[in-house]
Amino acid sequence: MRHRCNVPQLGRPADQRKALLRSLTTEIIRNGTVTTTKARAKAVRSEVERMVTLAKDGSLAARRQALGYIYDKQLVHLLFEQAPERYAKRQGGYTRILRTVRRRGDNAEMAIIELT
């Protein structure tokens, strides 16, 4: 039972939710920006921040953790090369969520999440 677990459910079972967050994280790191729903953007923000923090650490253990989470191996190597100098003076807050127009079909709140 999930008593008082504050995990955003996103209307999916746990395995599908984990796969969704992994794929969104991979695409944000690859493209720098993704348009998605506001709830998904808020949920994926912590995962992206965690991956950038691992990349700033740069250790072998951190690299292996990132390889286990991000789907693209070359993307992990690129992240570990670029993140330490790009975010050297920043202690978190690597992403930004911008609200945008609602989705036409179901009027869902949409947002753009991007790396800063």
From Swiss-Prot:
GO cellular component: cytosolic large ribosomal subunit
Molecular function GO labels: structural constituent of ribosome
GO terms, biological process: translation
SUPFAM superfamilies: Prokaryotic ribosomal protein L17 (SSF64263)
Annotated keywords: Ribonucleoprotein, Ribosomal protein
InterPro entries according to UniProt: Ribosomal_bL17, Ribosomal_bL17_sf
Record keyword Ribonucleoprotein present: yes
One of the Pfam families matching this protein, by short name: Ribosomal_L17
Entry superkingdom: Bacteria
Disulfide bridge positions per record: none
Assembly and binders: Part of the 50S ribosomal subunit. Contacts protein L32.
Annotated PANTHER family: LARGE RIBOSOMAL SUBUNIT PROTEIN BL17M, RIBOSOMAL PROTEIN L17
Family, similarity comment: Belongs to the bacterial ribosomal protein bL17 family.
Annotated protein name in UniProt: Large ribosomal subunit protein bL17
The encoding gene: rplQ
